[in-house]
Amino acid sequence: MQGKKILFISYDGMTDPLGQSQVIPYLSNLTKFGYSFVILSCDKPGSYAANRAYVENMLAPFAIQWVSIPYHKKPPVLSSLYDFYVLKKKAKQLHAIHHFDMVHTRPGLPSLIGIYLKNKFGIKFLNDIRGFWADERVEGEIWNLKNPLLKKIYHFFKAHEKACLAKADYSVCVTYKAKEIIHNRTDLPNQPLPVEVIPCSVDMNLFNPDKVDQLLKAAFSSALNINKDDFIITYLGSLGGWYLTDEMMHFCKAVADKIPKAKFLFIVPDSQSTVAAAAAKYGLADGQVIVQHGKRHEVPVLLSFSNYAVFFIKPCYSKQASSPTKHGEIMSMGIPVITNSG
């Protein structure tokens, strides 16, 4: 595939933290091997307006073109159907221009388009599994199966998951457990299917404690009222879903009761009020909780305040196929991680 053109379709925006931590670093490094990419993503209008220039600067040195369409959240289901229609139409237009050799998607709506492009145009299809997606939606309490429509959608995507595994030219996953689960499925023909494990990786040049911008750190220290003798425990990433917010806040309160100088830094896209409300349930004072959104280059600086980091994940079936990027990023900074068993 060296020297080939690849379409990467993402329902996550490049102007959101996930796109900047899990998509752009991977693809930018692959361009060094002669590949060129077009990223087709759905971006929240507010994030796009605020971060478009930042993302364009990230991509500028590489053979990567970025095409973004607006993400719609409401009304539920219908908004997703509309986004799918626009993504599919745009993917066809881009293929007419670039004549892609391969389409690379993660599960969900993008993989529907990946299968379509393979069937319609004979493009090779790379099925990139970052979690058992339909089950994640249920176990993350996004889809309630008591709702008949959502139950139908769940079963549709479970069938689609099977089709992706069966039809993909290759599948990749991030855990050996996921590969084992896939290869143990008796409802898939031609086992063992072509599956490779590529664990979540980290940019160790960026997440390097020896390369922290000390001027930026001093500015954050002043703005966030972080003192040298504070004991900082950090959470990185979005709250909710599969991450056990209540349990983490309970843990933070237990630490605060034992360590008076403890403060809890949340490097999150969530609002101050959202985090404060979750913390208040467990009696954490406003002065003990720090909330800061960080751009990609700012995250290592914010992490460098940490004595420890914490994240608790719901131990469920779907998460056997996922590997938190944050884990590698935190460890690359030399910060001990407190987490739960699964």
Set out the residue ranges of the language-model regions.
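Glycosyltransferase donor-sugar binding loop
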Residues: D43-G46, L236, K263-A276
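A short helix/loop element that forms part of the nucleotide-sugar donor recognition site in Leloir-type
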Residues: N51-M58, N208-N225
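Membrane-proximal helix-turn-helix segments that form the acceptor-binding/catalytic region
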Residues: Y85-Q93, L112, Y116-K120, W133-A134, ...
